[in-house]
């Protein structure tokens, strides 16, 4: 009798789970690619890398936790440590770096802004004052002596004189930020600190617009697709794509490529239009059919890290984009393409 009750309960549980996942693209097992377009790079230390930027096709910088700054002169194949002219007792988390030709900016936490006019040979530390809402989170180089700074409180500032003065772009900060991204045209999207809603700032707006999340699950990250529309990563390893341009309330049904207990942290589109998703425990997946089917990447699968950012960086001289996947504890993958 007990065995019959247990069997009936299991059938009911399977039925309920099936209803809960209906409408989703879900799988528990997916194939592994026969080859990988990535190679792992050996770094000199195991601090967490957080951002990467290039001056030209060969010369670039990688920044991260514990004042991490590395420099490459061979397109990212090898990296060497650099020192910043900052007192040794001051420890910073270098969050963001960006270049336009020889002009570059780095922002870090707490309250750090560095500016270079000679392709990163020398960096000048700038004062932001004590009234800045939040900490620096994202920096974008706009033009000569001009940059835009966004903070962990959702404040956005712009300088046109090399960082001597900063003018607010928004009338009011959006509040605590979990993640924040900027599109080339100046549009921002930001996830609230708890992931229970997100906000957008269009390129001509002076105020953030609030939007509800697409489901009951908290939002991990939001970003921009190559066509300018949004993608969303939520808890439970859910992926959603923005259905209609400019309509931030219209989302696809959830795509759940792999149920392995780990969330996705970032997404990106490679030069061939394939979708990449990265997350915990070496999760690095690719879809070559707009998210309908997925494969594991063998290099990512063998890397003992949580992948937190995926970059495909445009080259100013028209060469193919550079690709990098940043993982915790000093793990970095470099795009070499399919053979």
From Swiss-Prot:
A lipid is attached at residue 24 (S-diacylglycerol cysteine). Its main location: membrane. It is a lipid-anchor. Disulfide bonds: none annotated. The keyword Membrane applies. It is found in: Cellular thylakoid membrane. Residues 1-23 form the signal peptide. One of its GO terms (biological process) is photosynthesis. InterPro entries: PSII_CF48-like_dom, WD40/YVTN_repeat-like_dom_sf, Ycf48/Hcf136. SUPFAM superfamilies: Oligoxyloglucan reducing end-specific cellobiohydrolase. GO terms for cellular component: photosystem II; plasma membrane-derived thylakoid membrane; thylakoid lumen. Keywords: Lipoprotein, Membrane, Palmitate, Photosynthesis, Photosystem II, Signal, Thylakoid. A lipid is attached at residue 24 (N-palmitoyl cysteine). The keyword Thylakoid applies. A factor required for optimal assembly of photosystem II (PSII), acting in the early stages of PSII assembly. Also plays a role in replacement of photodamaged D1 (psbA). Assists YidC in synthesis of chlorophyll-binding proteins. Part of early PSII assembly complexes which includes D1 (psbA) and PsbI; not found in mature PSII. Binds to the lumenal side of PSII complexes. Interacts with YidC. HAMAP family: Ycf48 (MF_01348). A 7-bladed beta-propeller torus, about 55 by 55 Angstroms, with a depth of about 25 Angstroms and a central pore. Belongs to the Ycf48 family. This is Photosystem II assembly lipoprotein Ycf48. It comes from Prochlorococcus marinus (strain SARG / CCMP1375 / SS120).
């Amino acid at each position: 009798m007990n065995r019959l009750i247990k069997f009936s309960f299991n059938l009911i549980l399977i039925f309920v789970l099936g209803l809960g996942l209906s409408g989703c693209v879900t799988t528990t097992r997916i194939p592994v690619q026969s080859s990988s377009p990535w190679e792992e790079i050996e770094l000199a230390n195991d601090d967490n890398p957080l951002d990467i930027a290039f001056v030209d096709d060969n010369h670039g910088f990688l920044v991260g936790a514990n004042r991490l700054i590395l420099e490459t002169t061979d397109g990212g194949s090898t990296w060497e440590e650099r020192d910043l002219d900052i007192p040794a007792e001051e420890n910073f988390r270098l969050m963001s770096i960006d270049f336009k030709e020889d002009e570059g900016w780095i922002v870090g936490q707490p309250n750090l802004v560095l500016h270079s006019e000679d392709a990163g040979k020398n960096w000048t530390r700038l004062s932001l004052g004590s009234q800045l809402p939040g900490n620096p989170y994202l920096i974008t180089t706009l033009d000569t002596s001009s940059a835009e700074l966004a903070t962990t409180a959702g404040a956005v500032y712009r300088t046109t004189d090399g960082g001597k003065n900063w003018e607010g772009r928004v009338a009011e900060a959006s509040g605590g930020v979990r993640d924040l991204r900027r599109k080339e045209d100046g549009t921002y999207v930001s996830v609230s600190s708890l992931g229970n809603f997100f906000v957008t700032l269009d390129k001509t707006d002076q105020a953030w617009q609030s939007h509800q999340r697409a489901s009951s699950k908290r939002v991990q990250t939001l970003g921009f697709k190559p066509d300018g529309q949004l993608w969303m990563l939520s808890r439970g390893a859910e992926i959603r794509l923005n259905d209609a341009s400019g309509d931030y309330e219209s989302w696809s049904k959830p795509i759940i490529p792999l149920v392995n207990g780990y969330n996705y942290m970032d997404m990106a589109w490679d030069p061939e239009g394939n979708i990449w998703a990265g997350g915990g425990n070496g999760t690095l997946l690719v879809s070559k059919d707009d998210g309908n089917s997925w494969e594991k990447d063998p290099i990512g699968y063998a890397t003992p890290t949580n992948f937190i950012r995926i970059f495909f960086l445009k080259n100013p001289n028209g060469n193919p984009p550079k690709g990098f996947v940043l993982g915790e504890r000093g793990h970095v993958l470099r795009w070499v393409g399919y053979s």
